[in-house]
Amino acid sequence: MSRIGKRPIPVPAGVTVAIDGSAVTVKGPKGELSRVLPADIVVSQEGAELLVKRPSDEERHKALHGLTRTLVANMVEGVTTGFKRVLEITGVGYKAEIKPYGALLSLGFSHQIEYKAPQGVQITAPNPTTVVIEGASKEHVGQVAAEIRSLRKPEPYKGKGVKYQGEVVRRKAGKAGGK
């Protein structure tokens, strides 16, 4: 049995879980998330815990068992505490401004880039070189962070660009300025 899949998912107080066939909806203080899970995998609620069960030991069911448990656990965590990604902007003149629709990014191009945040994701900038992305869905928060980072990935010579907080950019030596 999957080691991850067989662990029960604790449901904290203030979170309600509705299971309708293969659809699971989780409501909590940070919002509401719903997802249609694979039809073979069964999610059941017993008291303040959710259990994920698989019908057989087929390879496909084993793979889906742990995945489904992790997806549901992320939904529960998202509606209780939420998820957060922090991006750092490095470079002369590189900055981010928060607008009502999302973010206005100056990343060294001849124009500024407008990034529209999807619904359920909040973008804030505590200072012009830091962007904080928060939301209930781990997928959406990670996708928005990846899209903003892809606008100007950190380059290896000077390290300019957008990177995740704590990301290490491998630096390269420039041209050897010898004779």
UniProtKB/Swiss-Prot annotation:
Keywords assigned by UniProt, alphabetized: Ribonucleoprotein, Ribosomal protein, RNA-binding, rRNA-binding
Superkingdom classification of source: Bacteria
Alphabetized GO MF terms: rRNA binding; structural constituent of ribosome
A single BP term in Gene Ontology: cytoplasmic translation
Cellular component terms per the entry's GO annotation: cytosolic large ribosomal subunit
Keyword Ribosomal protein: yes
InterPro entries the record matches: Ribosomal_uL6-like (IPR000702), Ribosomal_uL6-like_a/b-dom_sf (IPR036789), Ribosomal_uL6_a/b-dom (IPR020040), Ribosomal_uL6_bac-type (IPR019906), Ribosomal_uL6_CS (IPR002358)
Assembly behavior: Part of the 50S ribosomal subunit.
Biological role: This protein binds to the 23S rRNA, and is important in its secondary structure. It is located near the subunit interface in the base of the L7/L12 stalk, and near the tRNA binding site of the peptidyltransferase center.
Protein family (similarity comment): Belongs to the universal ribosomal protein uL6 family.
Protein name: Large ribosomal subunit protein uL6
Species the sequence originates in: Gemmatimonas aurantiaca (strain DSM 14586 / JCM 11422 / NBRC 100505 / T-27)
Taxon lineage: Bacteria, Pseudomonadati, Gemmatimonadota, Gemmatimonadia, Gemmatimonadales
